[in-house]
């Protein structure tokens, strides 16, 4: 099976609906055999990883972790859908404030753990 690259792709927010769909799409598009799934919510992340393992995608090296350093170290491509979910009673402004802090921390982590990253996409 041919892939576009052998470089590591990390999906941030992989336990969520968008992130888990991005992971499956990346696999089906044969982007890379080296896929790392990251989410701070470990139980949900494990469930997503197990679903992908059960699909039996050939030639894939799928790893998952709730450790941001492990997830980003060596990554050449990063796609992030990670952010706070909107809760009852929250305004868009409240959500923006929370997500701004998350985005700031994400940027610092990318700089620290994968300074040679080629592309970062934030959804």
Label every PLM stretch briefly.
Residues 91-123:
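Rossmann-like NAD(P)(H) cofactor-binding subdomain of soluble oxidoreductases
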Residues 15:
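Conserved glycine-rich cofactor-binding loop
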Residues 23-24, 107:
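Generic hydrophobic/aromatic pocket-lining and core-packing "Φ" positions
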Residues 25-31:
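A short, Lys/Arg-enriched amphipathic alpha-helix followed by its capping loop at the start of a domain
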């Amino acid at each position: 099976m041919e892939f576009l690259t052998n470089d590591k792709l990390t999906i941030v927010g992989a336990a969520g609906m968008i992130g888990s769909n991005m992971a499956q799409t990346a696999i089906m598009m044969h982007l890379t055999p080296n896929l790392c799934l990251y989410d701070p919510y470990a139980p949900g992340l494990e469930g997503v990883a197990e679903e992908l393992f059960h699909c039996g995608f050939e030639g894939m090296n799928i790893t998952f972790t709730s450790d941001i350093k492990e997830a980003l170290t060596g990554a050449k491509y990063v796609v992030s859908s990670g952010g706070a979910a909107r809760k009852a009673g929250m305004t868009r402004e409240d959500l923006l404030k929370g997500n701004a802090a998350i985005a700031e921390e994400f940027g610092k982590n990318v700089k620290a753990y994968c300074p040679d990253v080629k592309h970062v996409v934030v959804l």
